[in-house]
Amino acid sequence: MTTFHVLGFPRVGAKRELKFAQERYWRKELAEQDLLDLAKALREKNWKHQADANADFVAVGDFTFYDHILDLQVATGAIPARFGFDSKNLTLDQYFQLARGNKDQFAIEMTKWFDTNYHYLVPEFHKDTQFKANPTHYVNQIREAKVAGHQVKPVIVGPLTFLWLGKEKGESFNRFELLAQLVPVYVEILNALVAEGAEWIQIDEPALAVDLPKEWGNAYKDVYATLSEKVNAKLLLATYFGSVTEHATLLKELSVDGLHLDLVRAPEQLVAFEDYNKVLSAGVIDGRNIWRANLNTVLDVLEPLKEKLGERLWIAPSCSLLHTPFDLNVETQLQENNPALYSWLAFTLQKVQELSVLKTALEKGRTAVNVELDASQVAADARANSKEIHRPEVAERLANLPKNADQRKSPFGERIKLQNAWLNLPLLPTTSIGSFPQTTDIRRARAAFKKGDLSLEEYENSMKKEIELVVREQEKLDLDVLVHGEPERNDMVEYFGELLDGFAFTKFGWVQSYGSRCVKPPVIYGDVVRPKAMTVRWSKYAQSLTKKVMKGMLTGPVTILQWSFVRNDIPRSTVCKQIGVALSDEVLDLEKAGIKVIQIDEPAIREGLPLKRADWDTYLQWAGEAFRLSSMGVADDTQIHTHMCYSEFNDILPAIAALDADVITIETSRSDMELLTAFGDFKYPNDIGPGVYDIHSPRVPTAEEIEHLLRKALNVVPKERLWVNPDCGLKTRGWSETIAQLEVMMSVTKKLRAELA
């Protein structure tokens, strides 16, 4: 036989049932027991889906009310002491307070789960952190699954990855020092799972796919020797998100009973493990993307493995399926509008079925599933030959770009003189990042237009009214470079995706970002082309309302790529450059329309960095090229801005400088301008606008706070190159606090201008 299992399942439900229940509970509209009952029903459905597909185990312990790393903090007694909670007697309300904060304590920090778009809650480790086992979360889920008659495989993140994902707080120390006292707590937790009947336990160690310091890598041997010796269960060590070839010798000698490899992200690593003499779980179905697999091609890899390994071969998705939407079958609109694309997709339930087919083929031969294999082949062939996907003119345009197409005509020093001559801006010019408050009226108008209750003319008139309001308010505030406020945009990526060829949208393709927040990424399925102007009329209309300078607003190619499900039949770098070239048509049209300050937002550029530093240069080279291509051909006196959200820039500053944007605005207020110091040390050559207040809070900053930040900025950036702006877009704020915040920003700026004049 061939064992088939999954590493984890989506938690939120087919139609985001958990999200809506959580939010009703937080608003006190749903009783705790009702939330618990709904969660139990979702878990039971998840297990049934796995069992119905003939999975040999169901994954348990992967379900969470907010985040699996928060659950692990509770299970190891490592919740932040500052909350004053007892992890053994933690209430559901207290659990949510850890994630969302309360009146006395800010929430646990959140950051990206490796290089995915999921966010986990970062463990806070102190030198005196005391771990205590509390396996209730896992034990209860095992009991539920066993009552329902399932064979269980508990899933838990391993001790080294858990420590790796945390941060040291307080007194200076290295969190690695806590490993010795964490391991016995893991032993206790795992033995509690064994006591409930767990025969196999999956321990996730994705940290093996990053650049681990030597002492961390070396620690695996002793840690797993201890776990293996003291826990009477078979241990499956799961790695994913990248290659672990560099650890092959260590992993083959590790005291575990099986190893899971991500053969989608890193198929080449299989060679290093072909002589592995224990269970090898082959992650052959993509757990991070939505494309249907060519099952014949997958079997070409698996059949020789099966011959070699026999029953020691397990099959699985590459990683947890929490990164994929739930069920393609509910996408009836997509099936109707684009049946070809629909036939190329696989969501979680379809991926589980693909694994079921592979299991049967390995056990009984391909003929036993020839109908399914033929359907898979037909879809793969149709996709490979589709004229809707492959547009020769796009490949031709990319191939025939002029030499140095991604370079501006003149260096920044010459461009800025031409720009300053016509812009005629005061010292410390002010602007905002782009969006203004998206009011209930705006959202209602958009929803009514989408439903057909509002005509195109009525909708556009309501958007024009909003734009006029935004322009007039900025004029009253005396901002220098204005924006139109983006009332017509529901989302900074979706808006452009809807207007570019090569993109499609699902109705229920939601994936969890964090807690109750879900995102519905666009699908980039074909060559990207801009059929007509996307933003020009809105910016042109806004400019017609004012004599002040109006800034055009676009989302950059790297961010569009990062926040989408991306086609997997050509390199990501090629897709990114296609988007950049398509955007360049928009930039040139804006320029022709008289919009000569254009912002190309790239909040996600750092997110795209590969897990291993050795791969950074390649990524940064093509990401930078794609960004520069998006403004190719603009005149020297057109000013290109970019905006980047809260990031550590120190290690990629040369690449940021190489983007060669005339002005970069960055989110810095929460770090007290610390991020800006790196730009100063690096001697960043172009103009900079560090955010002077945090837009994520409705709080109105004091004049003293903004002045403090601006003076710090002036210590780092020459006054001639310093812009003044909020941290980020103002979409999520209300009008009253927006005006109040900008008034303070303007009054401080004017005070400093007078002083510096």
Swiss-Prot record:
One of its GO terms (molecular function) is zinc ion binding. Binds 1 zinc ion per subunit. Coiled coil: none annotated. L-methionine binds at I433, G434, S435, E486, D601. Pathway: Amino-acid biosynthesis; L-methionine biosynthesis via de novo pathway; L-methionine from L-homocysteine (MetE route): step 1/1. Its cofactor is Zn(2+). Keywords: Amino-acid biosynthesis, Metal-binding, Methionine biosynthesis, Methyltransferase, Repeat, Transferase, Zinc. One of its GO terms (biological process) is methionine biosynthetic process. 5-methyltetrahydropteroyltri-L-glutamate binds at R16, E17, L18, K19, K112, R517, C518, W563, E607. Its EC number is 2.1.1.14. It comes from the Bacteria. Pfam families: Meth_synt_1, Meth_synt_2. It catalyses: 5-methyltetrahydropteroyltri-L-glutamate + L-homocysteine = tetrahydropteroyltri-L-glutamate + L-methionine. Zn(2+) binds at H643, C645, E667, C728. Belongs to the vitamin-B12 independent methionine synthase family. HAMAP family: Meth_synth (MF_00172). Catalyzes the transfer of a methyl group from 5-methyltetrahydrofolate to homocysteine resulting in methionine formation. This is 5-methyltetrahydropteroyltriglutamate--homocysteine methyltransferase. The gene is metE.
